């Protein structure tokens, strides 16, 4: 049986991908980095944007997503929580 990632784990993967791109990433980079389909990526980006974890911006006709301070705080807490759960063999 294949375990599916939780919504929180997907959020963490998206935010981590943006962070790895110096806090600013194109949707395609996020799509591959977080291993999501286009439809699921769109849904999660809208959710993260509406919650204030990321901001959508355009530059020279290209769309980027930028990590906000709230997103950085969430990612920091998520990373700590993930390490804690990993220590006990629990998958998020």
What label would you give each PLM region?
Residues 15-22, 79:
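Short, locally clustered residues in the helix-turn-helix/winged-helix DNA-binding domain
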Residues 23-33:
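Short acidic, hydrophobic short linear motifs in intrinsically disordered regions
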Residues 60-77:
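Basic, amphipathic "hinge/linker" alpha-helix immediately C-terminal to the N-terminal HTH DNA-binding motif
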Residues 76-92:
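Amphipathic alpha-helical dimerization/coiled-coil segments
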Residues 35-50:
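Short amphipathic alpha-helical interaction segments
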Residues 49-59:
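A short, conserved structural fragment
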Residues 1-15:
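Short alpha-helical segments that sit at the start of domains
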């Amino acid at each position: 049986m294949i375990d599916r990632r939780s919504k929180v784990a997907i959020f963490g993967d998206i935010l981590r991908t943006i962070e790895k791109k110096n806090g600013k990433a194109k949707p395609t980079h996020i799509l591959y980095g977080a291993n999501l389909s286009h439809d699921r990526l769109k849904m999660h980006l809208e959710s993260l944007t509406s919650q204030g974890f990321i901001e959508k911006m355009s530059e020279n006709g290209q769309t980027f997503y930028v990590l906000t301070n709230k997103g950085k705080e969430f990612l920091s807490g998520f990373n700590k929580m993930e390490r804690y759960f990993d220590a006990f063999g629990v998958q998020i």
